[in-house]
Amino acid sequence: MKRMLISLILLLATLFLLGAKTVQVPGPQGSLSCLIRLPEGFNPNTERCPMVILMHGIFSSKDLNPMPALAKGLAEAGIASVRFDFDGHGKSDGRMQDMTVEREIADAMAVLDFVKGLPYVSEIGFLGHSQGGVVASMTAGRLAKEGKDVPKGMVLIAPGSVIKEACQGGKFFNARFDPKDPPEFVRCWGFMKLGREYLLGTQALDIYGTASAYDGKVCILHGTRDGIVPIWCSERFKETYGESAEFILIEGGNHMITRHRKEVVQRTTAFFKSVF
């Protein structure tokens, strides 16, 4: 117990020194666990800075890379970030089995409303990885269609729009199912549950049509050795956004960009510095 207490104190001290703060944001499905990271030396009481909302992929969390590395790089560039766990993921409320893309869009909207209420935030950007890229793009598109303020810029890393085709084909990772009548849930890798509502609802998503309403600047990054999300997903997003988007292939990069993280962080920070 004593060792655990010491470890907790050290962790909290480290987060404080790094300008990080954990907050709970009320979401449609329950509490969303968020981690705010501010630039080193930044005083939120007297200064203002831009903030990027980071959205992780399916079966991931705010604490798994590439999210922490991106938050660190942004902070070093003078840009704040908030990364959060979608409902049913990480430390947020809810069950993985109940997760849907529409619910994740609602989560993103809730975090956006929270960020808009922070007095030290000057401008807002979106970043999404994998399914988080789908959520980020559709959230930005919904905001535009509703005539609301949209993010100043957006980075999509291996945006996983292939989830629609996967659900339509009855094959999601190693799970097999009848796409017209899926079971209550399927298991991916034996322990990750995807519910019937996700398997049916994802088939009907108008991903690119919704995303197309956003006309801000977009940076799309995709590893050439991504074995999970095919490159054509990013190519479709590039076609959707046209001249307002730049599409960059990360040579040799896999889906999690494990060996090319420095390049991804550098390109991400350079993009946001150019739009803020």
Question: What is the meaning of each model-derived region?
Answer:
Residues 18-45:
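N-terminal cap/lid segment of alpha/beta-hydrolase-fold proteins
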Residues 47-57:
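Short beta-strand element of the alpha/beta-hydrolase
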Residues 59-71, 86, 232:
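The serine-hydrolase catalytic nucleophile loop
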Residues 58, 85-95, 160, 253:
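Short beta-to-alpha linker loops that shape the active-site pocket of alpha/beta-hydrolase fold enzymes
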Residues 71-93:
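Conserved alpha/beta-hydrolase
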Residues 119-130:
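Alpha/beta-hydrolase fold nucleophile elbow
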Residues 62-63, 89-119:
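Catalytic nucleophile-loop/oxyanion-hole region of alpha/beta-hydrolase
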